[in-house]
Structures are given as C-alpha cells and as structure tokens.
C-alpha cells in the first residue's frame, strides 16, 4: 500500500535549544487509521503541526500525497483536514456559516449538499443555524470536525478528538471515522483514550521524548508485546509461595487466596500445564481460574516507562 505521508529525518529544535522532535522517520499508508500515542509533551502535537504546515521544521523532509510541505505547501495542505486539540471557533458565527467559510479557505466551490451531509453525519444538522457560543463543548468539538471535512480532504488529523465529548457523542463520532475510512480517507489520530485506539487503529506508533520508539501493525503489536495473565483462586489461604514454584514468578495476592501467573502469548509453550501439575504436587488446590490479556494501554505504559 503506498504512503500518503512520508516523514524523513524530521527534527524540531526551538530557540531555547529544546529538541521537540529528533530524527523522526514515519510512513503513513493511504487509507489506514494510524494511532499516534505518547505521553504529554512527547511531541505528538508538534509533529502534527509540522505536517499540517502550522509549525516549521528544523531539519528533514515531509511530503503529503507526494507534495513537499515547504516547496508545494498549498497542494500539500489542501489534502489535509485538521481537528486541533484546542477549540478555536468564531463564537458568534452559526454552525453552517463557519463550516461553509472553512471550505472557502481552500478555494473550493460552494457545495451546500456536501456541507449538509457533513453536518448530518455529525448530528449537527439541527444546530446548523445556532451560534457556536450556545453549543456544549462536545458539540463544539463536532463543529471542529465538520470544518476539517468541509473541503473534502484525503487525510484527516484528529488531535484528541473526543476530549470533552460525552460517551454517546463519542460513539457516534467514531462511527463517522469508520465511514470516512470506508470512503478512502486516511486518518491519523492521537488520543488519551487508548482503548479507542485499540478498537479503531490499523497501525500504532508510539512517540516518547521526541523520538518514534515503535511503529507496528496493531494486531502484531498485541501478539508480540502482549502478555496473558492466569489468576488462580485458591481453596485455602497460603502465606508464601513454595520454593518449588519459584521458577514461575507467581504473584501472591495480599489476602493469600490467589496467585497470578504471567505468560507470553507468542511462546511455543505457556507453562500452564506444568504449573498446574507443580501446584498439585505442592499441595495447593484452586477453586476457580480466569485469564486476561494485556490491553494496548498496558503495552503503551510499559513502552514509555522503559529506560
């Protein structure tokens, strides 16, 4: 699948000497949903701002749809719709007016049918004549998405799109994102709701301290770095784990009534069969068991905490 965004050796250094981005290399594939994850201050918004032409790069090269963002800035920017983290809207303009105006900024001809479709898809149609100042935070966020889609971009950046949005509106918003993907739009999102990234993304990138530390297909990532946890609920309380079970690195619950065993999802052998046998030999019986698997959030936390 061809790359629609190509980022090569990208760096950003501020006047103070702070390096916000350090030799970032990244390829975004056409038509995918790409989740860019990282802690606060990791460089997510800086990276997005450079690709969208809002901030200047210090070194490196970025192309969007084959257009260099510096030498062919207009052509590159026209392909992009951006929903920024901060809410910037004309408070006293109507929803219809501000979305239509955004389309005009890209020299697109008027297209009331397209504006209507966008507003309906985002459940904003009944608010089309309302002034933005009267809307809730979640509805204002939807207006920002409508503005970003007004000129029919091929790429949509969503920087924390569900911040301040209630659960019901959030679900509806992700339905719109799925429909956009189905229509061929490439979507790059950042979110603190990592469960959403786990559900929505095709690929995941993790950025920390200005460096891309991982880019992986989501399914492969979950398989390669995910762990499974087996929890055994004991019939009788134990004070300590017997020495004969040390090799399993079991965790004993505070009340002494459960042990937890972590095993690798990609391993040829899980070790569970031998564990159960050794537990029996140690005179430990269990009444119930359950298993859980690492979430994307668990993997993310382990990656950014790594030295």
Indicate where each model-derived feature is located:
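Catalytic Walker B motif of ABC-type/P-loop ATPase nucleotide-binding domains
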Residues: 156-159
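Conserved catalytic motifs of ABC-family nucleotide-binding domains
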Residues: 152
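Short, charged/small-residue-rich alpha-helical element at the C-terminal edge
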Residues: 229-303, 307
């Amino acid at each position: 699948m061809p790359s629609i965004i190509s980022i090569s050796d990208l760096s950003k250094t501020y006047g103070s000497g702070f390096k916000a981005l350090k030799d970032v290399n990244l390829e975004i594939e056409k038509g995918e949903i790409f989740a860019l994850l990282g802690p606060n201050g990791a460089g997510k918004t800086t990276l997005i701002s450079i690709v969208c032409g809002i901030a200047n790069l210090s070194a490196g090269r970025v192309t969007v749809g084959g257009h260099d963002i510096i030498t062919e800035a207009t052509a590159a920017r026209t392909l992009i719709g951006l929903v920024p983290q901060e809410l910037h809207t004309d408070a006293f303009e109507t929803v219809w007016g501000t979305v239509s105006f955004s389309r005009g900024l890209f020299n697109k001809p008027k297209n009331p049918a397209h504006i209507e479709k966008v507003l309906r898809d985002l459940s904003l149609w009944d608010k089309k004549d309302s002034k933005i100042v009267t809307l809730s935070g979640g509805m204002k966020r939807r207006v920002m998405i409508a503005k970003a889609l007004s000129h029919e971009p091929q790429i949509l950046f969503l920087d924390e799109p569900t911040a301040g949005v209630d659960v019901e509106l959030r679900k509806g918003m992700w339905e719109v994102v799925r429909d956009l993907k189905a229509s061929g739009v490439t979507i790059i999102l950042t979110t603190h709701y990592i469960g959403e990234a786990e559900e929505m993304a095709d690929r995941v990138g993790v950025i920390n301290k200005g460096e891309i530390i991982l880019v992986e297909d989501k399914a492969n990532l979950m398989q390669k770095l995910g762990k499974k946890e087996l929890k055994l609920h004991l019939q009788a309380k134990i004070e300590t784990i017997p020495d004969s079970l040390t090799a399993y690195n079991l965790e004993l619950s505070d009340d002494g009534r459960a042990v937890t065993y972590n095993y690798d999802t990609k391993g040829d052998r899980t070790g569970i069969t031998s564990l159960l046998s050794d537990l029996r030999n140690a005179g430990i019986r269990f009444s119930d068991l359950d298993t859980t698997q690492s979430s994307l959030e668990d993997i993310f936390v382990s990656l950014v905490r790594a030295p």
